[in-house]
Curated annotation (Swiss-Prot):
PROSITE patterns: ANK_REP_REGION (PS50297), ANK_REPEAT (PS50088). Keywords: ANK repeat, Cytoplasm, Nucleus, Repeat. GO terms for cellular component: cytosol; nucleus. This is Ankyrin repeat-containing protein P1E11.10. It is found in: Cytoplasm; Nucleus. PANTHER family: ANKYRIN REPEAT DOMAIN-CONTAINING PROTEIN 39-RELATED. SMART domains: ANK. It comes from Schizosaccharomyces pombe (strain 972 / ATCC 24843). It holds the Pfam family Ank_2. ANK repeats lie at residues 36-65, 69-98. It comes from the Eukaryota.
Amino acid sequence: MSTTTPNIWIAASDGKTDVVLKHLDSGISPNAADENGYTPIHAAVSYGHSDLLKILVERGGDINIRDQDGETPLFVCEKLEIAHDLINQYNADTTVKNNDGLIAAQVIEANGEFPELAKYLYSFTDLEPKDVNTLPNDTKIEYAKLMTEQEMDEEAGQPLLDQKAKAEIDRILALRDTGVNVDDELRKILTGALSGHFERNVRPRSN
């Protein structure tokens, strides 16, 4: 009974180093891209195969190679230790922007699954996280005012808030002036507004 050898991208995803090496020895580039621009390096990073990543880089892999969405392997990273190696050992560029104008830290933050990883990536940039859950209460108040005053996101060219959200923030701020504690309400609406903004700009990640 014959078996089919998995292609290099599946082998890299599964961490099958021996199969990946056979593909490399047969002449396939570590930078070979599938129809979506996805490379073996993207796969190794996404699934956390550090030993395989090392081999791919040693065989000429480009750590900052982009897929069709303009995303480098750093964008699909899910583990702190892999991110550490990408940046400190392989010199991955944390400032690369994808086709939507977002850096890896912003994309990972927007996905919401790996907040510590996003925070780590932000530490290598001049940008600040937009997660309002990490903001002090007074800062949430000022952030709410800023979002109602700033009509457009300059990078995306889209409204930061719709009219309904602006009206709700105005209502909450008015309640605060009467002495009512509105921190939880502000947190919820700001989180929702930011999530909606990112959903318009970030493609869903898939395994």
